[in-house]
From Swiss-Prot:
This is Esculentin-2-ALb. Its main location: secreted. It comes from the Eukaryota. Coiled coil: none annotated. It comes from Amolops loloensis. One of its GO terms (cellular component) is extracellular region.
């Protein structure tokens, strides 16, 4: 009976250690996942800002050229 208790105690101890190691790895993996998501969101925002900025500059450039042509022809 005593040897059975020892072996069960040993199995419980080893199981507890392996479980704690798995939890540490899982939390480390979750941290990496959050960094990846943050990078993904940042790159998406950055790309959208570039697109909007280019379109605004094109529109401003067209308006500026039209305004200069208007001034040059004195039709404003």
């Amino acid at each position: 009976m005593f040897t059975m208790k020892k072996s069960l105690l040993l199995l419980f101890f080893l199981g507890t250690i392996s479980l704690s190691l798995c939890e540490e790895e899982r939390s480390a993996d979750e941290d990496d996942g959050e960094k990846g998501v943050k990078r993904g969101i940042f790159s998406l925002i950055k790309t959208a800002a570039k697109f909007v900025g280019k379109n605004l500059l094109k529109q401003a450039g067209k308006a500026g050229v039209e305004h200069l042509a208007c001034k040059a022809n004195n039709q404003c």
